[in-house]
């Protein structure tokens, strides 16, 4: 049975403000608040809200329907602040049980190409955030713009993810089809789900260029060769309402998919469901691929000298930022890492949207001014310490962290090993429990002896040493108690006899 795996990305560009050279060292706020609020409210109203409402209704009407999402941490922060109704809708669709949330880098940046530790820290933060919001830790990973290579695959597998989404690029697939499940060449534990470029971009890129009907699109899926049962349709949620206006009928197209798919015997699957299946083989990806531009590589972010200079300068302080505890520095770091900052600097033809910038050189100058101020703030946190000293401290912290992680793994291994011997542990606990009452009786006997000891202290000291006195005091204690009961009567009677004699 053929299955469609639908996935949509939710990310929001954070716009930087115009920042002059003379602002360095004086102004530490880098954001265009007006443009950020305006853009996210427009996108929420025109795209996110109607698209999510449609998907929620589709989940309710069609129990077999499935859809997956991923959110960037920076985009999520903007939504929570400016458009919380979108987060509410995401939680509502999550409650249907027909949705999966994937993990991606918190900043929607390029840390996977620069610094392994920073990349791992970002992924962990986003995984924790997804768990906090939606109650379930993600099992499948999706890198920024589907960036992938074999090294990234090995890192993601080491983090515990079962699968990763990436592009079905021609230079990687060759004669192979994206309609199968593959695995990472560096680590077979990680499954690869490859995007069907043509079927995905029929919706995301070309929907309004030519009339596309849902039945025609599903006929193309149904006509794929027998055995090619995995159809991965990946795109951005802003496809509905921003890339293509709602007046184009794109939401009606989306609504019709479950009904027409059922008629053709086509089902739906979540990424984690597909990753649980067996792969047909490995795919080797020695160089970077992504879902951007015709080249399907990283040239739109790192294709010219300006982009590489900004990229290298930003990640030159990655280790310092990671170990610092300044929350404001961390927030600015997330925003400055966002991939759109580098994409605004591209000199490739055909890319026209640059935000507030007039040219790629304008974008580079503004970004480097902000980066200069940011790096000086980071360096000030370390009191002018040189790079060698800081690198030594960072290495020491990393080694200690690795040692702790190794100990945690060893503890977990031993704990699981002990669980196999539960029956013996239970019998040992029972035997210990039987011995405990006898111990309690001995302790109570000692307490009673210690209470009686003061009454016979004088006699015991005269007759026996202290060590022997503890054993012989207890029989005499009863006699002392009996004498103590009779002695008050004798004492009261003594004055009366004395008075009679007088």
Regions found by a protein language model. Give the residues of each.
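Alpha-amylase-like alpha-glycosidases and glucanotransferases acting on alpha-linked glucans and related
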Residues: 174-222
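Short, well-structured secondary-structure segments
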Residues: 3-8, 14-115, 139-142, 162-167, ...
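Short, surface-exposed basic-aromatic patches at helix termini and helix-loop junctions that form
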Residues: 92-95, 150-165, 183-186, 249-263
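CE4/NodB-like, metal-dependent polysaccharide N-deacetylase domain
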Residues: 118-147, 219-234
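Active-site and substrate-binding clefts of carbohydrate-active enzymes
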Residues: 2-46, 180-181, 186-190, 208-209, ...
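Generic structural signal for well-ordered alpha-helices
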Residues: 52-56, 87-91, 120-127, 153, ...
């Amino acid at each position: 049975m053929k299955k469609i795996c639908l996935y949509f990305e939710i990310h929001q560009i954070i716009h930087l403000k115009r920042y002059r050279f003379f602002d360095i060292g004086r102004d530490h706020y880098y954001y265009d608040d007006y443009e950020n609020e305006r853009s996210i409210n427009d996108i929420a109203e025109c795209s996110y809200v109607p698209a999510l409402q449609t998907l929620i209704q589709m989940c309710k009407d069609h129990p077999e329907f499935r859809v997956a999402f991923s959110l960037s941490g920076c985009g999520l922060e903007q939504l929570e602040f400016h458009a919380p109704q979108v987060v509410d809708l995401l939680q509502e669709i999550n409650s249907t049980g027909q949705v999966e949330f994937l993990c991606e880098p918190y900043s929607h940046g390029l840390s996977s190409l620069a610094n392994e530790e920073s990349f791992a820290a970002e992924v962990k933060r986003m995984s924790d955030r997804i768990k906090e919001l939606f109650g379930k830790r993600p099992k499948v990973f999706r890198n920024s713009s589907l960036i992938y290579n074999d090294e990234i695959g090995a890192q993601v597998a080491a983090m515990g993810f079962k699968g990763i989404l990436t592009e079905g690029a021609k230079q990687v697939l060759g004669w192979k089809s994206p309609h199968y499940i593959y695995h990472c060449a560096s680590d077979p534990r990680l499954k690869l789900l490859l995007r069907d470029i043509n079927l995905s971009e029929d919706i995301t890129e070309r929907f309004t260029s030519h009339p596309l009907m849902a039945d025609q699109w599903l006929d193309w899926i149904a006509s794929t060769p027998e055995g090619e049962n995995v159809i991965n349709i990946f795109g951005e949620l802003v496809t509905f309402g921003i890339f293509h206006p709602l007046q184009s009928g794109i939401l009606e197209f989306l609504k019709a998919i479950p009904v027409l798919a059922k008629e053709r015997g086509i089902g739906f699957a979540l990424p984690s469901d597909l990753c649980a299946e067996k792969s047909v083989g490995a795919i080797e990806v020695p160089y970077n691929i992504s879902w951007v531009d015709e080249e399907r590589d990283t040239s739109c972010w790192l294709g010219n000298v300006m982009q590489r200079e900004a990229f290298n300068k930003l990640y030159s302080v990655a280790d310092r930022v990671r170990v610092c505890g300044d929350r404001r520095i961390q927030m600015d770091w997330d925003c400055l890492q966002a991939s759109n900052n580098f994409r605004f600097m591209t000199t490739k033809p055909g890319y026209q949207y640059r935000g507030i910038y007039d040219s790629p050189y304008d974008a580079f100058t503004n970004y480097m001014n902000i980066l200069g101020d940011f790096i000086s703030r980071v360096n000030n946190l370390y009191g002018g310490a040189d790079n060698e000293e800081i690198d030594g401290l960072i290495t020491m912290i990393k080694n200690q962290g690795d040692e702790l992680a190794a100990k945690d793994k060893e503890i977990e291994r031993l704990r699981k090993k002990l669980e196999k011997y539960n029956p013996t542990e239970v019998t040992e606990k029972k035997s210990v429990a039987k011995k405990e009452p006898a111990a309690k009786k001995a302790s109570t006997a000692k307490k009673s002896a210690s209470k009686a000891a003061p009454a016979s202290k004088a006699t015991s000291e005269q007759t026996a040493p202290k060590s022997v006195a503890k054993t012989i005091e207890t029989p005499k204690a009863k006699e002392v108690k009996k004498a103590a009961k009779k002695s008050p009567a004798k004492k009261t009677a003594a004055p009366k006899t004395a008075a009679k004699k007088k």
